[in-house]
Structures are given as structure tokens and as C-alpha cells.
């Protein structure tokens, strides 16, 4: 669920996700096209691809269960949709954390009209 994803990102990065990531680069937030602008934007590209692979459910609105153990996200539960969705969100949140040093404020509200490179496939 998007609200759970928000909490994961906040825990992993310390940043407010809606401000910091909702409009970042060419892939963070709604939609996506062109080539990812940097490593953070690539996290969003990979997250979008991960969601595309989740079939038979709507990953954006599926609730899942997770916990934090020693600073690590642990996805819990059994149903396919929720477990896979949680893993997609977990990977993205960790990716954001791992790329904090290269986060660029200039991409924070990047207009998608500048995302003109050919779109990469998953």
C-alpha cells in the first residue's frame, strides 16, 4: 500500500517521501518515461518494473505486513500479492537509502517534459 511504502522510505532515508521522491526525476511518482536521471531515479524505475511483474492484483493498494528488525525491513505474510508487493517496496526503500549521497535537489520536482530519451525496457 502506498502509505506503507511511504513509512518504509521515511524509516530508511529520514526524508519525507512525498516531498523528496513523489516528483523526483523521470520515474518517481506517477508514470515514467525516458531514461532515469540518476541512481535515485533508477530506484523508482526498478520499483515500477517490480510492480509490473505482480500479476493478478493491484500492488499500489494491496495492504501487506512488515516489521523492522535491527533496522532491516522484514516482509511478512503469505498471500502472493502482498508479499511480492512488500518486497518491491522494501527493495526501493533500501535503494533510496543506499543512494542518499547522490540525491540531487534539482531532480526533486523535475518536469517530465525533459524526460525525452528513449524509454528503457524492464
From Swiss-Prot:
Catalytic residues (UniProt): 47, 89
Tissue occurrence: Expressed by the venom gland.
Entry EC no(s): 3.1.1.4
Subcellular location: Secreted
Coiled-coil regions, chain positions: none
Entry keyword Cell wall biogenesis/degradation: no
Highest rank taxon of the organism: Eukaryota
InterPro entries in UniProt: PLipase_A2 (IPR001211), PLipase_A2_dom (IPR016090), PLipase_A2_dom_sf (IPR036444), PLipase_A2_His_AS (IPR033113)
EC class (word): hydrolase
A GO-annotated cellular component: extracellular region
Gene Ontology molecular functions: calcium ion binding; calcium-dependent phospholipase A2 activity; phospholipid binding; toxin activity
UniProt entry keywords in alphabetical sequence: Calcium, Disulfide bond, Hydrolase, Lipid degradation, Lipid metabolism, Metal-binding, Secreted, Toxin
The keyword Glycosyltransferase is annotated on this UniProt entry: no
Binding site for Ca(2+): 27, 29, 31, 48
Needed cofactors: Ca(2+)
Biological process according to GO: arachidonate secretion; lipid catabolic process; negative regulation of T cell proliferation; phospholipid metabolic process
Cofactor note: Binds 1 Ca(2+) ion.
Signal peptide: none
Function: Snake venom phospholipase A2 (PLA2) that displays edema-inducing activities. PLA-A is three times less active than PLA-B in edema-inducing activity. PLA2 catalyzes the calcium-dependent hydrolysis of the 2-acyl groups in 3-sn-phosphoglycerides.
Similarity-based family: Belongs to the phospholipase A2 family. Group II subfamily. D49 sub-subfamily.
Name listed for the protein in its UniProt record: Basic phospholipase A2 PLA-A
Annotated organism of origin: Protobothrops flavoviridis
Lineage: Eukaryota, Metazoa, Chordata, Craniata, Vertebrata
